[in-house]
Amino acid sequence: MAARSIALGTIRFANDAPFVLIGGINVLESREFALEVAGHYKTVCTKLGIPLVFKASFDKANRSSIHSYRGPGLREGLEILQVVKDTHGIPVITDVHSPEEATPAAEVCDIIQLPAFLARQTDLIEAMAKTGAVINIKKPQFLSPSQMSNVVEKFRECGNENLLICERGSNFGYDNLVVDMLAFGVMKHCCNDLPLIFDVTHALQCRDPSGAASGGRRSQVVDLARSGMAVGLAGLFLESHPDPDKARCDGPSALPLALLEPFLQQVKAIDEVVKALPTLSVS
């Protein structure tokens, strides 16, 4: 099966092409913060020759606690993302949570993302599809890999073929996630080899059953990223923070920003080795 390819300007997403980094922060904390972090990502990725799409959320609509920080909201958040895009000359991605957010988000962002918890919401899918934007579909934690074909089919029936699919772990008992390495191949097969992204940081989430926010295992991010890259991915989804312990959301899963360059050096090395190997089919 030939790998599907999705173009985003000069960036090409395909499972047999050099990987693209969808990297950034979990949630927008301020304009200055977003510009600073995006600038660091651009510097590192330019040095290493890694295509970059900068990620940030304007609203974390699915926080566990009503008291948790959600973000600046749609209007201010999109204004910040536009400034980041214009200042650094890099494409941007954000997630949307309601049909009304799809069009304004697509007017600013190069990719819009369907959150994992909302991946079966048909009205939202239809609104996102109609924008014509490239869509990153997060696989829900509760959905089997093969069931992603139904989500993909909804988008196609709504007229959008510009699709990326994203693995972010699966429920393993209560309050825990695991990444099934066999799932990558299943998702590629059932979705006709659409470009596959691996969200390594959200896959590290592990909840305290009595806690009001998600915990995480960022000490294992290198292990998980190396493992994921070995299956041949179109892209890696990564969130970083200069001080993860002070992050407004998902700090326990975030890579310390100071480690971005050595981390990506290792990831790129594995990607290059894997994609230089001949295809070996086992029936």
Swiss-Prot record:
Enzyme class: transferase
EC nos: 2.5.1.55
Recorded metabolic or biological pathway in which this protein acts: Carbohydrate biosynthesis; 3-deoxy-D-manno-octulosonate biosynthesis; 3-deoxy-D-manno-octulosonate from D-ribulose 5-phosphate: step 2/3; Bacterial outer membrane biogenesis; lipopolysaccharide biosynthesis
GO molecular function terms listed in the Swiss-Prot or TrEMBL record: 3-deoxy-8-phosphooctulonate synthase activity
Keyword presence, Transferase: yes
Catalytic activity: D-arabinose 5-phosphate + phosphoenolpyruvate + H2O = 3-deoxy-alpha-D-manno-2-octulosonate-8-phosphate + phosphate
Location in the cell: Cytoplasm
Designated name of the protein: 2-dehydro-3-deoxyphosphooctonate aldolase
Biological source species: Prochlorococcus marinus (strain MIT 9313)
Gene name per UniProt: kdsA
